[in-house]
Structure formats: C-alpha cells, structure tokens
From Swiss-Prot:
Residue numbers binding Mn(2+) 2: K257, D262, D281, E343
UniProt-listed GO biological process terms: proteolysis
Cofactor binding description: Binds 2 manganese ions per subunit.
Cofactors: Mn(2+)
Lineage: Bacteria, Bacillati, Cyanobacteriota, Cyanophyceae, Synechococcales
Annotated organism of origin: Prochlorococcus marinus (strain AS9601)
Name of the molecule in the record: Probable cytosol aminopeptidase
Main location: cytoplasm
EC number, as in UniProt: 3.4.11.1, 3.4.11.10
Metal-binding as UniProt keyword: yes
Protein family: Belongs to the peptidase M17 family.
Domain of life: Bacteria
Length: 490
C-alpha cells in the first residue's frame, strides 16, 4: 500500500471514494470545499434532511452522487476548539476499514488548516493504513474483494513537501508483528521465526546470529533450555544487530519473549486459560522483530541496536521440565520451578543475561508475561517497570507520541520475599497478589544493575477480539511503534 497527495487543481482530480471531514460549525461553507465532485447546494439539502451537524464521530454516506465519484463519506469532527488528533485518527481509521473492501484507492480531505504539523499528517496516514490491514494468508478461498492499494490526501497545500516514506516503514514493521502473532503455531515455529529474522537481516543489512541448542548449552542457558526441552521442535536463539555508520553514541538491546506456543507444560492450561490462543505468547518477540524491520529501513544514526529473541515452545513430553525442578540460568543463579506455566520469565532470564553481557546502555524487554497485568490495566494499556527514571520518562514520551498506551508500575522491593526458595536462589513465581510485579522483580535478577532497564508486559494489548481504534480484530502489533519512536527520539 502506498500514500500519495493531490496538490494541484482539484477540478482535475479523479477518484472513486472520498472521505470528507467537517466540523460541527457552519456546514454550508465547508461543503463548498468539495464542489469539485458534487453540487454543494444539493448536498446541503441531503445533509440537512439527515439532521447531520458534524458532531464528533457521526458519519453520512452517499453513493453515486455524481459521475465523478462513487462514494462520499462525510465524517463529523466535532467543534474546532475540542479537536483531538487521536479522535480524528480513530474516526478516519474506522471509515477506511469500512470501505477497504470496496476500493483500490481511498482519498481523504480534511480541514488541514487545523492540523499543526507534518507529524500529525503522517500519524493520520499511519492510522489509516493500519486500520485497513487484512490478513487472508490462511483462507482457502482468498478474498476476492478489491484490495486497498493507495491512500491519497487531497489539498495538503501547507505540507506540499511531506514524505510518507518513514510512515510506510513503521507500518510495515507493525504489519510484520501482526502477521507473526496471528500465525498458527504449526506455521510459526521457532525455526520459522529464525527464518523471518534472517530475512529482515538480509533485506536491511543487519548482522544475524542464530544460536542452536548446543550453542545455548555451551553458554549454560539452563533456564531457557529447561523450557525448550519439552518440545520436539528445536529452540532457536535469535540475535540481530543494527549498527549505524560512523561513531556509536549509545548501545541498546531489545529483548522479546518468543514462546511460539505455550501449553503451560505440566501445569497445563485448562478451563478458561485460552490454550487455543497461546500462539500469541510470542507477542514480545514479534514487536522486537517488527521494530528491527522498521529501524533497519529507517537506519537511525549513532546507535548500535541488538534485537534478541529466545524462541521455543513450552510443551509436554518425557523430557519436559517438572514442577519442582531446579535449573541454573546463564548468570549462575538457580531457580526452583514451582510453576511450569511461568515459562516466559525463564526464557527471558537467559535472554536478559545474554543482552547484559553485550554491555548495552539500555535494555528493554517486551513480553506477554502475566494475566495479572490484564486484571490490573485491561486490554488497552500495557504496564511497564523500570529501574531508571530517565528511561521511564523517555518511554512515557514515546508512548504518548506513538499512541500505544503505557502505565508505569512499581518495582516494589518488599515483594521479592515472595520469590524466596528453600532450596534454590529463587522461585520462578510468587504469590498471586502482585503477580505482574513479582514477575518484573524476577527479571531484574538477570542483568547488570548498572544497566538502564525497562520491562513492558503486553499480555493484554497484543490481541483484540474486535475492531478497536486503528486495530482490526486480531493481532495488534503493539510495541513496535513505541520502540521505534523511542529510538527516533534519541
């Protein structure tokens, strides 16, 4: 899909579908802005008959108004003094999603004089494209409806030199993350994930290293391998590196949980545990690889960025880890496994240790780690923890810019008491209360304390069961935009 603009005389414009935004003010004068496709007086009569006043979120749709236009959708933006860019993005996104099956090209005309910057225009374009996303890979009969190939913005006079190249690159990263999360577990195996990572490296000039089980044994990754050995599929430890040309001012590691399927192990997921949805337990790794794809195209300057994923399945066989086993992570700490369904933190323990040994300035990990964070924050907001105020504030800023909502949670040190073990250095789970916090405290044990670190729990935000905002039902690709924005802000 591409973005385009039409800046010349609108009388020469040709198109089939137009989305036109109006304010909750003098409608008649605003309708003059589309006289190039329809008689504004005739349209005003129809709008008046429908008692449409431009209220926020209200829409009117007209078919075949003129030979020059097949569909006109008028969307209310509310009062100019209350204009909110997020509301505009969601409104346009919803409309694009509703018309995506009907048109190869959708054109958009808004009161651009109320848009403050090129950034707001590109964010609108991003929302429109991500709202139009469809995944038909696994349908026997492919969707025969029209495929949206172009989103066009009309009359962007004050932004005539605008570029959507970076916007498209970010969208491609989000779309990759969505595809990875949505893929069934018999399709997206650890092997396939490593192939996807290798393709990113080849396409964008990143270094790639795939560690096999023997390599991980040599590095004494006992926690990661304890999870992986219950599956007949070999684990793949993925490490991509993006190095800017010229002097490196900062080194960063992005770590993603990569459970391509989680049965729960011997603490088997039963009842309402949604075992059938555990293909999305690699949502953190999808965000990291999506960010790698986007950043590989954007090529930020002065940075060395490491993308790390410990990919495997959590399954049951004769070799699977038992509840009560004690394993040793690659930093030498021993862990009593009191719950095999708290496996993500075990894989992350060795992934974080590996990242720490690279001596980065910052580490950010993303994981669908706990149900507790969903209970705490629901499905619209991800929780995050950090050991550094500057990093936390930078993430909050990136979150606000990207539109992906984060909420900082406490690293309550007294809760570490719940992780104490009588036979090992620690247990892998604490009591039910404060479960997302004790999970973060567990992870904090596996990297150098001098490194700035943040952990983002995306268990509630990586999937939506229904269309919501810019996200069609299914995988959201949550985390890609925030990671990319955080990097861009440096």
């Amino acid at each position: 899909m591409q973005f385009s603009t039409f800046q010349t005389n609108l009388d020469n414009w040709q198109g089939a579908s137009l989305i036109f935004g109006v304010l909750e003010e003098e409608i008649a004068s605003q309708l003059e802005n589309i006289k190039f496709v329809v008689d504004p007086k005739l349209l005003l009569k129809k709008v008046t008959q429908k008692k449409f006043k431009g209220e926020k979120g209200k829409t009117l749709s007209f078919e075949f108004l003129d030979q020059k236009l097949e569909t006109l959708i008028i969307v209310g933006l509310g009062k100019s003094k209350d204009l909110n860019k997020s509301d505009i993005e969601n409104s346009i996104g919803n409309l694009v999603r509703k018309t995506v099956d009907k048109n190869a090209k959708i054109s958009i005309l808004l009161p651009w004089e109320l848009i403050n910057s090129q950034l707001e225009i590109t964010k609108l374009a991003e929302s429109a494209r991500l709202s139009a996303y469809k995944d038909n890979r696994f349908n026997k009969k492919k969707d025969e409806k029209k495929v949206l190939k172009e989103i066009e913005f009309l009359n962007l006079k004050q932004f005539e030199n605008i570029s959507f190249e970076e916007t498209a690159q970010i969208c491609e990263g989000v779309e990759l993350a969505r595809k990875l999360v949505a893929a069934p577990p018999n399709s997206l195996t650890p092997q396939e994930m490593s192939l996807q990572a290798s393709k990113i490296a080849k396409d964008h000039g990143l270094e790639v290293k795939i560690l096999e089980a023997k390599d991980c044994e040599d590095l004494e990754m006992g926690a990661y391998l304890a999870v992986a050995k219950g599956s007949d599929l070999d684990p793949k430890f993925i490490h991509l590196t993006l190095k800017s040309e010229g002097p490196i001012k900062e080194k960063i590691a992005l770590v993603g949980k990569g459970l391509t399927f989680d049965s729960g192990g011997y603490n088997l997921k039963v009842g309402a545990s949604q075992i059938e949805m555990m293909k999305y337990d690699m949502g953190g790794s999808a965000a990291v690889l999506g960010a790698a794809k986007a950043l590989g195209a954007i090529k930020p300057k002065g940075l060395e960025i490491h993308f790390i994923v410990a990919a495997c399945e959590n399954m049951i066989n004769g070799s699977a880890v038992h509840p009560g086993d004690v394993v040793k992570a690659s930093n030498g700490k021993t862990i009593e496994i009191n719950n095999t369904d708290a496996e993500g933190r075990l894989t992350l323990a060795d992934a974080l240790t590996y990242a720490s040994n690279l001596n980065p300035d910052s580490i950010i990990d993303l994981a669908t780690l706990t149900g507790a964070i969903v209970v705490a924050l629901g499905n619209d907001v991800a929780g995050f923890w950090s050991n550094n105020d500057d990093l936390a504030n930078d993430l909050k800023a990136a979150s606000a810019q990207s539109g992906e909502k984060l909420w900082q949670m406490p690293l309550q040190k007294s809760y570490k008491e719940g992780l104490k073990s009588h036979i090992a250095d620690m247990k892998n789970t604490g009591p039910r209360a404060g479960g997302s916090i004790t999970a973060a405290l567990f992870l904090e044990e596996f990297f150098d304390s001098e490194i700035k670190w943040a952990h983002i729990d995306i268990a509630g935000t990586c999937w939506t069961d229904k269309n919501k905002g810019i996200n069609p039902s299914g995988a959201t690709g949550f985390g890609v935009k925030t990671l990319v924005q955080w990097i861009k802000n440096k």
